[in-house]
C-alpha cells in the first residue's frame, strides 16, 4: 500500500509540478469526507432498523432491497424541498447557521487516524484540536435560534447551548486524564500506548486498553457525548411534547437536513474518539490468529459501530430527562466525579502499581 501511494505521489508530482501538493490535499480531503457522508446517510437507516428491531418491527424495508435505498430517497426528497426563510428573520444569519454547525463536525475529522499511518493531518495536539473545533458548533445553534425570530427556536437554542457547554467541561476533564496516562495528545500515540503492558505481552490486548482502568471515565465520556449531541434521553432541546424541533423549528429542506448531518457526523466522531482513547483503536482485541488476520481498519470500524449502536440503544430504551435533571447530572455528578478521578489517577501514577509505565 505504501508503495502504491509513493507511486501515485511521484506520478502526480511529475505531471502537475507546483500544483501537486494542493491537488493531493484535496484528494485526501475528499477521501475522508465522501465516505463520512455515506456513513452519515446510512447511519440514519441503521438507527431506524435497530429501533425497529427493538420494537419488534422491521423498520424501513420498501425502498430498494431490504430498504437499502431509503437514505438516498430521503436525500433526494430533502434536496427537492423548498428552503423557506421566515419573513422577519435575520436572513443572512439564518442561512449561515446550518453551515456554522456542520463545518466543525467535518473539520474535526482532519486529525482522526484510521490506521498507524492513515491520517489526514498527524498533529501532536490532535486531542486538543478535536475538543476546540467541536466547541464551535454551539455558535451555529445559538445563531440559528436567534436568527429565526421565534420564541420556540430561541428557547431551544438557549437550552442546547447551556447543555453543550456544561457537558463539555466533564468531557474536557476526561481528555485530561487520557493525556495524563498516555503522555501525549497525538491520537496515534494514544492508540499505540494501549498496546503495551503485561496483558498485551500475554496476547490479551483488550485487557490493556484504557477502558478497564478508566471504566468510570469511559461511561462519563459516552453519556456526556450523548448530552453533547442533544440526543435522547437528553433531547429536551427538541422535545416533541414541548418545543417541537428546538432551534431547527423554522428550517426546511437541506438547511434543516444540515443540522441532522452535523448531529450524525458528530455521533461517528464521538464514537471513533471513544474507540481511539478507550478501546485500542485499530488494534486486535487478542494478539493471535485468527484475530490478527483481520485488518486494523475493520477492527476500528467494528468498535466504532458498537459505540454508535449504544447511542441508538439509549434512544430506544430510556425516558427523557427533565432539563433541571440534565443540568444537575452534569454539574453536580459528572464534573465532581471527573475531578476526583483525575486526582486518583495522578496518585495512582506515583505508586509502584502504575500500570501505564
Swiss-Prot record:
GO biological process: aerobic respiration
Family: Belongs to the complex I subunit 1 family.
EC code(s) of this entry: 7.1.1.-
UniProt keywords, alphabetically: Cell inner membrane, Cell membrane, Membrane, NAD, Quinone, Translocase, Transmembrane, Transmembrane helix, Ubiquinone
Main subcellular location of this protein, as a coarse class: membrane
Residues annotated as transmembrane: 26-46, 92-112, 127-147, 164-184, 203-223, 259-279, 294-314, 329-349
PROSITE patterns linked: COMPLEX1_ND1_1 (PS00667), COMPLEX1_ND1_2 (PS00668)
Any GO CC annotation of this UniProt entry: plasma membrane
Gene that this polypeptide is encoded by: nuoH
UniProt superkingdom: Bacteria
UniProt lineage: Bacteria, Pseudomonadati, Pseudomonadota, Betaproteobacteria, Burkholderiales
Protein name: NADH-quinone oxidoreductase subunit H
Keyword Transcription attributed: no
Catalysis performed (reactions): a quinone + NADH + 5 H(+)(in) = a quinol + NAD(+) + 4 H(+)(out)
UniProt-listed Pfam families: NADHdh
Record note on quaternary structure: NDH-1 is composed of 14 different subunits. Subunits NuoA, H, J, K, L, M, N constitute the membrane sector of the complex.
Entry's Gene Ontology molecular function annotations: NADH dehydrogenase activity; oxidoreductase activity, acting on NAD(P)H, quinone or similar compound as acceptor; quinone binding
Protein source organism: Janthinobacterium sp. (strain Marseille) (Minibacterium massiliensis)
